[in-house]
Structures are given as structure tokens and as C-alpha cells.
């Protein structure tokens, strides 16, 4: 047995009994759900996946919350200790007992210094209580995908989900502060006294409070973005297969609508209004329509039935249709709204004299979702798209676009790929991760070797926290030109 394994066993044996039992129970629950996920499919499978995701997130957040609480509580305690020391009362005179002096210190009195000290004690308790409430609401955020669901977001749900964004930013800023503190401490111990570390040590509580304040600033800035209208971003893409004696074709691209606990009917109605005002020839919904079941969010989704385009409204699945709802029920809902579902299918249309083949493939995640009959099949989706038409593919994840471009046969069939999924990162700290995980991140791309364009939308909405970077809630208006 390695020395690392021995250390782990020794650490476990040193834990108290209650902690050992808690770890064993949590481990047993995770293993049981993981086994159950392998043996189920369809709706039962996605419900287990959601439950397991919540448990994994909650388990990870316990450690993160302990870390945040220790740091912030240290800063609050030190700050109020400093303030109280500045308001200390004179030492009791010889004619006053210690108990009388203590009573006079704590009880309101004509002495303004004593009253200030009492108020500081109360403010410290209030600050600590508010921090505990913040952590609690952050922990229960994921449960609002199951409770208080309806046509419009619940106020408590919006607050809790917003706090998740502040929580993530605070955690990251605290980690950055600690990396700076301990790295300078290491240098300080090996070389001459380090003025940087001395400064960080003396002002550590203020840097922790700064991390807290910055977290909430980013949260409120993100709330402003998601509570204003999505911007319309225009793009012009030349199509070599277009007939010179015919007109241009416009497409309104909507991706990542994410109808759910933080996106309701009012928001969807506004998106529909803005989209219809563009008078597009085609409307494409490139996945991640909803984060729940039709029975919970049909009221919020109903305005989608008002989308109008002469060339039709088309939909292809994203990963969230498989993770958060019954995808078949959403297909029925959309078809009843005269929205064409492209379930590894294509449709031939003629718009403004131009021949088009609009295709849609199931999301990359579909196969892993264990939903019978679902899985990305690009050959089937593009099967009847011919070389004499301009072929458009709806593929939610940009990595699906990469698969198409890497295939010599498929790439000949596609002229334009429309994707979403990335949210452009959604929040600033996640931008590097999105760039690492996706072949394309945001905006217009051109692959010269295949003469194919890819457009990735940052999404019209957001997932989970109603927080997004400035200018990243967008409706894409593409004009395909000759």
C-alpha cells in the first residue's frame, strides 16, 4: 500500500464517529444512484441524473461553503473587533464593581460610547446571520427546478439562483486572494522581509470583504443584463450556391431559450416580439429550449406559438431537453405550435427563389441520455440534402460542427451550421473553460477547407442563475447573400 493511501486511512480513522457515518452514507447514496442510472432509460433516467447532479453539487458546495464561511467570518470578526477597540470605555473606577461596570457597558445609557459598542455587537451578529442566510439560499437553489414552478419565476427562486452566481464569484475571488497571500508568505519566509506579504497580512480582512463585495457587484451587473431586452446581432454570410437571379434569405437564430425557474412567460413573449419584428424568412431554434417538463412550463412556453416566418420555424434538440425534461412531450408541444421538429431530419423549402435544405440533428448528449430512438445521426439528418441546394444544419453543440467539418463526406453537404450551447461563458470566470471545452465559442467562423460557415450564438437567455455578461443575451439575424 502506498504512503498516500496509508495517510488517507489514518486520516479517516482519526475522524469522529458522526463524520465517518456521514461520509459512508453519502458515498453509499452516490454509488446507488450511479448504479440505478445505468439500469434505467427515458424519463426515469433523466430524473435520476438530475437528482444525482443536485447531490454531487450539494456535496461539493458543503466544502466550498465551509471555506467561504471561515474566510468571511474571520473578516467580519476582525473588522468589528477593530471598530469595538476604537470605542472601548474607560476602565471601571475603584468605586464600581466589575459586574456593575459590565452592566453599564452593555445596557443603553446616556454614555454615547457604550451605546456605539452595543450597536457594533448587534451589527456583527446581523452580518454573520445574513452570511449564513446567503449560503443557505445558495445551497437550495437547485431545488427550485422542482418546486414553485409556473408561468413566471418565483421571487425566492430568482433570489436563490442569483445568489449562486454571487457565490461562484466570491469563491473564485477568495481563492485568488488566498493564492496571493500564501505565495507571498512562502517568499517572505525564504528571503528578506516581503513588503507585499506584510501589506496583504495587515489588510487581509479588507481583501476578503472586497471579494465579497465584488461577487455581489458581478451578480447585480449580470442581473441587469438578463432583465433588459436581448440585443439583435446581425451577420451577413455569402452563399455560393445561391441563384444570382433570386433574393437574399434571412434567418433569426434563437438558441438556449432555457424556459425554466428563472425564465418565464413575460421574457419569452418579449423574445418572440423582437424576433417577429425582424421579419425573418426562417426562424431556427438551436436547442436548449426548456429546463423542465411541459406540464410545469407550458404556460411560459406558449408565446413561442406566435413565432412567424414564411419559410417556417425549425427546432433541433440541445442537451437540456434530455437532462431536464421529457423530450417527446416537448416535441408534441412544438408541433402543435406549427414548429417543425428536426429529429435527425431535414426539410426542403424554397424561399425568395432560393432552394434550401434545413436539417437538424439530435444533440451530442442524446445518445448518453438513454432516451430510446434518440442520438445524433448526422448522415440521416443530411441524407437527402443535395448539392444543388443551400444546406443549413442546426446542431446545438459547436463540437458537433467540428465532427461535420472533420468528415470529408458530410462537410460537402453543409454550407452553414447554426449552434449555441456555450452561452459565451455566461459569467466571466467561466470564459476560459468554455474556450477549452468547445471547438467554436461565439460568433461567425469560416472553414476554408470545406467552404462552410459556422455561427455560434451566445444564447438569447441563460441557464440557472439569471446572470450573464454584458451584451451576451442575443438574437442572431443572419442574412444569406448571393
Swiss-Prot record:
Which cellular components does GO assign to this protein? membrane
A Gene Ontology molecular function term for this protein is: metal ion binding
Q: What CDD domains does this protein's entry cite? A: MPP_YkuE_C
Report the Pfam families cross-referenced here. Metallophos
Superkingdom in the source lineage:
Eukaryota
Q: Where in the cell is it found?
A: Membrane
InterPro entries referenced in this protein's UniProt entry, alphabetically = Calcineurin-like_PHP_ApaH (IPR004843), Metallo-depent_PP-like (IPR029052), Metallophosphoesterase_sf (IPR051158)
Class of enzymatic activity (EC top level):
hydrolase
Kindly list the positions annotated as binding a divalent metal cation 2. 288, 319, 421
Q: Which residues cross the membrane?
A: 15-35, 129-149, 156-176, 205-225
Q: Topology with regard to the membrane?
A: Multi-pass membrane protein
Question: What SUPFAM superfamilies does the record point to?
Answer: Metallo-dependent phosphatases (SSF56300)
Q: Which residues bind a divalent metal cation 1?
A: 256, 258, 288, 423
Keywords on record: Hydrolase, Membrane, Metal-binding, Transmembrane, Transmembrane helix
EC numbers, comma separated: 3.1.-.-
What family is it from? Belongs to the metallophosphoesterase superfamily. LOC643853 family.
Q: What's the protein called, per UniProt? A: Putative metallophosphoesterase F40B5.2
Amino acid at each position: 500500500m502506498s504512503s498516500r493511501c496509508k495517510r488517507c486511512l489514518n486520516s479517516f480513522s482519526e475522524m469522529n464517529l458522526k463524520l465517518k457515518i456521514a461520509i459512508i452514507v453519502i458515498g453509499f447514496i452516490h454509488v446507488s444512484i450511479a448504479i440505478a442510472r445505468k439500469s434505467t432509460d427515458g424519463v426515469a433516467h433523466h430524473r435520476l441524473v438530475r437528482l444525482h447532479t443536485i447531490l454531487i453539487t450539494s456535496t461539493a458546495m458543503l466544502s466550498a461553503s465551509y471555506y467561504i464561511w471561515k474566510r468571511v467570518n474571520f473578516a467580519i470578526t476582525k473588522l468589528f473587533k477593530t471598530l469595538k477597540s476604537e470605542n472601548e470605555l474607560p476602565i471601571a473606577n475603584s468605586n464600581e464593581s466589575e459586574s456593575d461596570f459590565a452592566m453599564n457597558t452593555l445596557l443603553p445609557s446616556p454614555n454615547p460610547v457604550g451605546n456605539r459598542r452595543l450597536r457594533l455587537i448587534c451589527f456583527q451578529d446581523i452580518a454573520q446571520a445574513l452570511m449564513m442566510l446567503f449560503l443557505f439560499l445558495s445551497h437550495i437553489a437547485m431545488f427550485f427546478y422542482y418546486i414553485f414552478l409556473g408561468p413566471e419565476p418565483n421571487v425566492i427562486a430568482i433570489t436563490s439562483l442569483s445568489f449562486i452566481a454571487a457565490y461562484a464569484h466570491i469563491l473564485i475571488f477568495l481563492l485568488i486572494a488566498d493564492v496571493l497571500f500564501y505565495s507571498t508568505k512562502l517568499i517572505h519566509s525564504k528571503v528578506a522581509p516581503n513588503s507585499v506579504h506584510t501589506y496583504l497580512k495587515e489588510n487581509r480582512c479588507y481583501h476578503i470583504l472586497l471579494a465579497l463585495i465584488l461577487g455581489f457587484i458581478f451578480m447585480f451587473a449580470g442581473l441587469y443584463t438578463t432583465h433588459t431586452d436581448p440585443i439583435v446581432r446581425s451577420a451577413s454570410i455569402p452563399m455560393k450556391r445561391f441563384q444570382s437571379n433570386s433574393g437574399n434569405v434571412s434567418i433569426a437564430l434563437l438558441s438556449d431559450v432555457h424556459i425554466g425557474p428563472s425564465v418565464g412567460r413575460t421574457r419569452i413573449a418579449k423574445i418572440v416580439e423582437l424576433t417577429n419584428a425582424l421579419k425573418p424568412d426562417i426562424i431556427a431554434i438551436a436547442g436548449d429550449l426548456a429546463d423542465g417538463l411541459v406540464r410545469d412550463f407550458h404556460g411560459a412556453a406558449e408565446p413561442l406559438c406566435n413565432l412567424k416566418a414564411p419559410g417556417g420555424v425549425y427546432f433541433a434538440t440541445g442537451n437540456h431537453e434530455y437532462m431536464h425534461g421529457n423530450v417527446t412531450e416537448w416535441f408534441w408541444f412544438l408541433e402543435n405550435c406549427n414548429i417543425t421538429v428536426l429529429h435527425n431530419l431535414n426539410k426542403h423549402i424554397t424561399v425568395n427563389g432560393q432552394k434550401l435544405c434545413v436539417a437538424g440533428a439530435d444533440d451530442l448528449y442524446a445518445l448518453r441520455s438513454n432516451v430510446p430512438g434518440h442520438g445524433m445521426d448526422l448522415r440521416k439528418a443530411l441524407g437527402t440534402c443535395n448539392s444543388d441546394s443551400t444546406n443549413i444544419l442546426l446542431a446545438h453543440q459547436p463540437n458537433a460542427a467540428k465532427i461535420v467539418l472533420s468528415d470529408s463526406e458530410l462537410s460537402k453537404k453543409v454550407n452553414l451550421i447554426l449552434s449555441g450551447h456555450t452561452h459565451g461563458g455566461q459569467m466571466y470566470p467561466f470564459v476560459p473553460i468554455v474556450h477549452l471545452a468547445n471547438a467554436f465559442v461565439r460568433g461567425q467562423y469560416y472553414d476554408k477547407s470545406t467552404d462552410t460557415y459556422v455561427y455560434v450564438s451566445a444564447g438569447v437567455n441563460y441557464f440557472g442563475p439569471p446572470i450573464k455578461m454584458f451584451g451576451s443575451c442575443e438574437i442572431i439575424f443572419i442574412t444569406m447573400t448571393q
